[in-house]
């Protein structure tokens, strides 16, 4: 009857009751299955979940954390509440202050970006660097920046330079420890000031004629070569420059040009500057209606020696301020030379190249040589 009852229940019941019928055989089959599939997870065999250990030993990590807490001057318990440098990179920085919140974990006292913004906008400049690392000379923007710099940390009172503002003590106390990071914007500021000053000087030089730069270089090179040729005791003073102004009449209309002559005997350079145009009445004429080309020719009686020319465009200014330089002239040559000025029309059409006027002036009589 029992067998018939089992057959009536079906094959599932027989499979479940097979272990009861043959207990030794069932235990052997289970042990073989477990040994063959040891890595398979089953409901009756689930391993315990364990957290892998840290790569750094706990003692070394605790010692490092304690040293950081002591250096930052914060509560040691606040550092242990939520310490994980891998997940909280900001908390792993020792110079950032930390505090324990009401919820029991550690947090930053302030944002790490706050002090950076304050240092750019409100922080004072750092201590001055030694002069060996600077590019500028004595006075200038570098010296001004150096007088306004203050020490990085509040220390004993030092006498400030007269006329230099001193920052308040609370501003000095609020400054962060990483003040050396502020040297970068300070260096960029001083470099920008030096670049702006050099650009302004370049623009000033470009407005004036390039002949003045050549004369300045020639004048600076000649005294530099003087000590090598003669002893310092017998140094001869640099000869003075001869300067004079004169007027050159152009044609029969009575128009004239005002010239300024400057001659340096040491360098042998003669500079002629066109100052302005004059009317027959002696005053400044009206606006020039045409553009003209002015040619200056240095010629002894009979032959032409050197020639320079320039184009003067239309302008409402009566002054020309054009320079013509001639090099390698001795006093004897300058004494015998005369300057001839020609003005030609530089307009368009048939009038182009028409002679507007010409005149001549003796340099020896002008410079009193």
From Swiss-Prot:
Signal peptide coordinates: none
Expression tissues: Specifically expressed in endothelial cells.
Matches recorded under InterPro entries: C2_Ca-dependent_4, C2_dom, C2_domain_sf
Domain C2 stretches: 253-369
Cellular component terms per the entry's GO annotation: nucleolus; nucleoplasm; nucleus
Keywords: Nucleus
Expression triggers: Up-regulated by pro-inflammatory cytokines.
Region annotated Disordered, chain positions: 151-176, 197-240
Residue ranges with Low complexity bias: 220-237
Protein purpose: May be involved in inflammatory process. May regulate cell architecture and adhesion.
Protein name: C2 calcium-dependent domain-containing protein 4A
Native source species: Homo sapiens
Gene: C2CD4A
């Amino acid at each position: 009857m029992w067998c018939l009852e089992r057959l009536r229940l079906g094959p599932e019941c027989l499979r479940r009751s097979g272990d009861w019928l043959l207990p030794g055989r069932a235990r052997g089959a289970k042990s073989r299955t477990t040994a063959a599939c040891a890595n398979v997870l089953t409901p009756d065999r689930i391993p315990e979940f364990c957290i892998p250990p840290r790569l750094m030993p706990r003692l070394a990590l605790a010692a490092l954390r304690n040293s950081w807490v002591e250096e930052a001057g914060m509560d040691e318990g606040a550092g242990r509440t939520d310490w994980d440098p891998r997940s909280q990179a900001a908390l792993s920085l020792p110079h950032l202050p930390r505090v324990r919140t009401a919820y029991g974990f550690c947090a930053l006292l302030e944002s790490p970006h706050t002090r950076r913004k304050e240092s750019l906008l409100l922080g004072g400049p750092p201590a001055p660097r030694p002069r060996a690392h600077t590019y500028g000379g004595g006075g200038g923007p570098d010296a001004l920046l150096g007088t306004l710099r203050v020490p990085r940390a509040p220390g004993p009172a030092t006498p400030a330079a007269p006329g230099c503002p001193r920052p308040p003590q609370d501003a000095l106390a609020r400054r962060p420890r990483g003040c050396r990071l502020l040297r970068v914007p300070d260096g960029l500021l001083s470099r920008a000031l030096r670049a702006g000053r050099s650009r302004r000087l370049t623009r000033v030089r470009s407005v004036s004629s390039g002949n003045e730069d050549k004369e300045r270089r020639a004048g600076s090179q000649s005294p530099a070569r003087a000590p090598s040729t003669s002893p310092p005791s017998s140094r001869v003073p640099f000869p003075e420059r001869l300067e004079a102004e004169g007027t050159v009449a152009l044609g029969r209309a009575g128009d004239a040009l005002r010239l300024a002559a400057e001659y340096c005997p040491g360098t042998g350079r003669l500079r002629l500057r066109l100052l302005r145009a004059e009317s027959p009445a002696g005053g400044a004429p009206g606006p020039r209606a045409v553009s003209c080309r002015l040619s200056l020719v240095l010629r002894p009686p009979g032959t032409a020696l050197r020639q320079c020319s320039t184009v003067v465009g239309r302008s409402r200014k009566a002054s020309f301020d054009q320079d013509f330089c001639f090099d390698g002239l001795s006093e004897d040559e300058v004494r015998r030379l005369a300057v001839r000025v020609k003005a030609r029309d530089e307009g368009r059409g048939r009038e182009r190249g028409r002679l507007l006027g010409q005149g001549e002036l003796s340099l020896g009589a002008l410079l009193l040589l």
